[in-house]
A protein has these predicted regions:
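Conserved beta-strand in the GNAT
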Residues: 61-63, 69-78, 85-90
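A short helix-loop-beta-strand connector motif used in the catalytic cores of GNAT acetyltransferases and
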Residues: 44-63, 72
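A short, internal acetyl-CoA/4′-phosphopantetheine-binding micro-motif in the GNAT/acyltransferase core
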Residues: 89-96, 122-124
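Conserved GNAT acetyl-CoA-binding A-motif
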Residues: 111-124
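A short beta-loop-alpha structural element at the N-terminal edge
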Residues: 6-20, 29
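Conserved GNAT-fold acetyl-CoA-binding loop/helix
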Residues: 26-50
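Conserved acetyl-CoA-binding loop-helix of GNAT-fold acetyltransferases
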Residues: 91, 97-110, 135
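Conserved active-site tyrosine of GNAT-family acetyltransferases
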Residues: 133-134, 139
Length: 160
């Protein structure tokens, strides 16, 4: 753990703050890579996505506190055979230059040392995410996924 970065279980009182951060992070990524000003996964802008992720039986969700501020969150799905999935990772764009994504990913790998395989899915247009997962975290492209409405995502994997 970085001395400035803490990971705490998400509680109901965190939903509103985390949703605001999620809106900012997803909308920034969307506007950077598309003609849209705002977009994200269903429920990203009304507390329902963070609630769903946090309350799912096989998921573990943590908020990320940096310098005494909540700056994001992550959710890990724990699947059979030590195959894990990073369901969500978002960080407030104001903290992007702090390299928190890399710090958080390293902490996740240290927490889940028994993981033999990691999977993450991200929009096909999100070049910055592709770079982060492949160049910073060691994932490799696995396949493309058709999501409906013409949307696509890329699935990346990392084997240990």
């Amino acid at each position: 753990m970085n001395d400035k970065t803490l990971y705490k279980k998400i509680s109901l009182v965190d939903y509103s703050v985390l949703t605001k951060i999620m809106i900012s992070a997803f909308n920034e990524d969307t506007s950077m890579h598309t003609d849209l000003k705002e977009d994200g996964p269903t429920g990203y802008n009304d507390d329902s996505l963070i609630k769903l992720l946090n309350e799912h039986e096989n998921f573990e969700s943590y908020k990320i506190d940096y310098k005494n501020n909540t700056v994001g969150a992550y959710t890990v799905a724990i699947n059979p055979n030590n195959e894990y999935s990073l369901e969500m990772l978002f960080i407030d764009p104001k903290y992007r230059e702090s390299h928190l994504g890399s710090i958080v990913w390293k902490a996740i790998e240290e927490k889940y040392v028994d993981a033999k395989k990691w999977t993450v899915e991200t929009p096909d247009y999100s070049k910055r995410n592709h770079h982060f997962y492949t160049e910073k975290c060691g994932f490799v492209f696995h396949r493309e996924n058709a999501c409906g409405n013409g949307a696509k995502s890329f699935i990346f994997e990392k084997q240990k």
